[in-house]
């Protein structure tokens, strides 16, 4: 069976706009894994709970570098030894509207806050239960990672702010 790559991308963009997850796999020569990607702008508590339940549960929030700067999110480790150069920032929770921060509802709330165009550093607390990731400028053309794929897909879907969330899919 032959797949039309353009049709697959269009289907993924449609699903992101509808708040549904898409599965993005990388090369077997890289991490050899797949991540669920949801748009923080369109997803629901139910989909966040689903992603937690059917993934590693480790939720990341990819965003463009300028967005991380606006939220005053420094890198977790300034001189990372990660060979893949994943740019983790400090973890966060929403400053308001959450309890412990760990529930799907609380993490969904944190994602909503991170996705709000007018959100500032005062809208999140550190540390927390969501791990923002800083995407490389230029997207997958400059770094073929899930972080950049998530941000690029949200951009192509016309979702603002260009922001997503990832959950590693075990066994991929």
Language-model regions: role of each:
Residues 1-172:
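Catalytic domains of riboflavin
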């Amino acid at each position: 069976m032959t797949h039309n790559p353009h049709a697959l991308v269009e289907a993924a963009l449609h699903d992101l706009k509808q708040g549904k997850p898409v599965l993005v796999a990388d090369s077997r020569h890289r991490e050899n894994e797949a991540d669920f990607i949801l748009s923080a702008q369109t997803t629901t508590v139910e989909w966040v709970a689903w992603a937690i339940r059917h993934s590693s549960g480790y939720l990341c929030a990819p965003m463009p570098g300028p967005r991380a700067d606006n939220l005053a999110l420094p890198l977790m480790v300034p001189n990372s030894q990660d060979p893949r150069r994943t740019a983790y920032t400090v973890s966060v929770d929403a400053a308001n509207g959450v309890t412990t921060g760990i529930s799907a509802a609380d993490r969904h709330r944190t994602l909503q806050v991170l996705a709000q165009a007018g959100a500032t550093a005062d809208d999140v607390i550190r540390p927390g239960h969501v791990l923002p990731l800083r995407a490389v400028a230029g997207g997958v053309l400059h770094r073929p990672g899930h972080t950049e794929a998530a941000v690029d897909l949200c951009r192509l879907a016309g979702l603002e702010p260009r922001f997503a969330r990832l959950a590693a899919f075990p066994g991929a």
